[in-house]
Amino acid sequence: MGKKQEKKTAKGRLDKFYWLAKEQGYRSRAAFKLVQLNKKFNFLEKARCCIDLCAAPGGWLQVASKFMPANSLIVGVDLVPIKPIPRTITFAEDINSYKCRDQLRQILKDWKADIVIHDGAPNVGTAWVQDAYAQSELTLQSLRLAVEFLTAGGTFVTKVFRSKDYNNLLWVFNQLFKKVEATKPSSSRNVSAEIFVVCQGYKNPARIDPKFLDPRHVFKELDPASLADQDQEAGVPLSLKGTSAGNAHANVFEPKKIRRNREGYADGDYTLFHSLDAMDFIKGQDVIGMLGSYNQISFESDESKKLLSLPDTNDEMRENCSDLKVLGKKDFRNLMNWRKEVRLALGIDLPKSKHQDLAEQTQTVEVEEMDEDDQIDDELARLNEEAARKARKERRRKNELRQKKILKMQLQMTTPMDIGMDVMDDQLGAGNGDMFEISSGERVSKKALIQQADVSDDESETIVSSQHTDDDDPETRARRLDAEMDALYDEFKQKQSERDAKFRAKQARLQDAKNDSWHGIKDDEENDEDDDEANLSDESEGGYDLVQRRKEQEETFDTDDEEDEEDERLEREATQHSKKRKRDLAAPTADSFEMDAKPPKRSLVHSLVSDADVSAQQSREASIWFDNPLFKDLELDEQDAQEALEDDQDDEDAWEEEQDDEDDAEESDSEVEGEQEVEDDDFEVVPQDQEEHAIPDEEWDLNGEDEEAGKQKRIKDHGLATAEAVALAQALVNRQITKEDLMDQGFSKHNFVDKDGLPTWFLDDEQKHYKANIPITKEAIQALRERQRALDARPIKKVAEAKARKKMRTLRRLEKAQKKAETINENEDISEKEKSNTINKLLAKSVKGAQKKKEVQLVVAKGVNRGLKGRPKGTKGRYKMVDPRMKKELRAFKRKAKRDGKKLGSSNSKPRVPKGYGPRN
């Protein structure tokens, strides 16, 4: 068989880069051109903003997205839509339109592009000269768009076709960029005339002449006739036109710059040495052209010899005239000055006198008188010009400010100017000497409370008396600020409880008096006093509120100053009263609801919130209040119990999640010890003697027993779940530590830290994060990992069920075969040999039924297998040779059988009979 020919179309485009692009997922083979350019010049890794012009289908965008840093801005533009590419922004627009520029400005905002890449080409197919000019024009248009968005020092990469306009483009590139280099990557086909120009270091000029980027001026062809006229006017002979001497200015002022002669010599000019008579040099007009065109100034004529006798013609001038090609700038200037002096000496040029200069300066000019209309027109023109000048000046000033602002934003030097704007003047507490007053937050909360409920006269008097305290006393102000901070923190917790179920469940546990932290062993008298104080307080106060009330009661005051005691007493009463009022508003009773149902009283303060919103808010606050664990023991009817169960479902879920996430360390200690309960201070409360401190039955902590039993059951079912628990268990088992040692470790200096006078938010933060770290061992981590590996090695539920079903079916088949074997064995009509053979067949059939029947392998009879006799190469087991004809016939046979309603089988199948050979009717 002949070898399969590789597909080759479009001059071999299906090369290795084509297959590499398909393997790596690039949309075009042109992506490797940018990859190789970036490998050589390394411009993508340092860029943060990139613009791809003529980007379809998106190969260069994929490369830019791959090599540029993360969070870079990449924008692609093309006439046709581009399929989305990760980390890029694309849109379809013409790069010559103003709409394209506006859309780019909207996307870039204040950014400037670090790199602009262009790999576009126009529609070709006409004359080659026209296609080359269209490509050069497209490149110049992309450059015009690039200079608008490029930052200083940016890079511009473009594709250029080799043509006569290539040098003009390079000249423009060199004027705008510091470094311009043309290269042809290996991925570019050799038959293609494309080359790539990498322009680095954009100069960012202040202004660019529009003609500089206009194709009509950049690619303009010079007329040879006009060049000849210019050379004749300059005094350059035709014999020197086209030579290096023709560029006289370059030869005079840049003598080191060598210009090669690429156009040959003039007709009839067989020498390279040209001499100029001195008198012709003196009388000529184009001095620079003559100095750059000729090699020597001779004094051979009679008129020229007279010049040698002049005093200005010294030996230095004669030496300079002998060879003009070796002179420098200073020598050429000396020759030009010598020419001026000789022209004055010969009378060709007349010197200007002082009287002539004065006459020229004082020359009078007759001014015609202007009529009234002309004066009005001149005045209007002057005013318009002045207004235009002022407008230009203002526009220039705004542009400068805008440029400075953009520069600051690019350098990240901006300062947010709206700091403090959200605080109103009435909240700044003007007149009390402080710039920021925390009392403003309390005033806002009080205003909201006034809108929700009418405050009684005695309450308002208490609030006013608490506000008008002596601000001059720093201690009083500090205590007042602490009280205000606590009030704001309580308001924050209330709002957080409305939003977050986890936070609400956590606060419910903290409010529970049973979860109060241990503060040491006290005497019976102190305990009795604490019990009396607890009975006097609100029943809703839990362990955390007890801490707050104890902190307020244990404050030390100045007993010498009676006024301070009075102020502090009023302040405490105001704080307690405000807390009580908040609880009353948060937990509306039946009386309060009845009061709300009555017509509202007339007041000077009117709420802007509707009654529906107020009722919804009160219902939310009521639901939060009844979520307290104290209400869970109340007897409810069936409907109320069902509603309470639905409301508390979220809280229970949140409590379980938080307990699993945050209290792993505490659970580990309790899991190891069994009956040991580890709190934030990590030690166990040791019970006292039963005779001295007997606990009544009604005060026994049943919830604690349930919690411990639940922990023990969880440990028994699932084992230890944390590394700390495993480490402590290993230490106990290996006799490295005893239970008494663990109890002793629970007593530390942290258990008796004085927390009086500390703010509530600080105590909450300490309770959450201030915990003792339990050391873990490498063996504990290894044990947990081994356990996790064992759990991971177990099959999933579906696989296990499938294996169980397969095993069950096998057992059923064996059981069925065993019953048949017993029946055969009980039959006395057959011999033992026949019984044995029949039983063996039954067992083999039952086992064979469990095995999967091998499918017949189909081999297509084409290619190397066409006309093959014997087993095809590479096939094992049963096989069947098929061909397209057989496939079509089988499909037709099935279709016909389905139409006739027949079942496929050997009885229905009939042999094929050629047409014309069947039986005649």
Curated annotation (Swiss-Prot):
Belongs to the class I-like SAM-binding methyltransferase superfamily. RNA methyltransferase RlmE family. SPB1 subfamily. It holds the Pfam family Spb1_C. The lineage of its organism: Eukaryota, Fungi, Dikarya, Basidiomycota, Ustilaginomycotina. Signal peptide: none annotated. This is AdoMet-dependent rRNA methyltransferase SPB1. Keywords: Coiled coil, Methyltransferase, Nucleus, Ribosome biogenesis, rRNA processing, S-adenosyl-L-methionine, Transferase. S-adenosyl-L-methionine binds at G58, W60, D78, D94, D119. It catalyses: a ribonucleotide in rRNA + S-adenosyl-L-methionine = a 2'-O-methylribonucleotide in rRNA + S-adenosyl-L-homocysteine + H(+). InterPro entries: RNA_methyltr_RlmE, RNA_MeTrfase_FtsJ_dom, rRNA-MeTfrase_E, rRNA_MeTfrase_SPB1-like_C, rRNA_MeTfrase_Spb1_DUF3381, SAM-dependent_MTases_sf, SPB1-like. Residues 448-476, 491-604, 635-713, 814-835, 866-921 are annotated as: Disordered. It comes from the Eukaryota. The keyword Cell cycle does not apply. Residues 523-542, 555-568, 635-684, 697-708 have a biased composition (Acidic residues). Residues 491-522, 814-823, 880-892 have a biased composition (Basic and acidic residues).
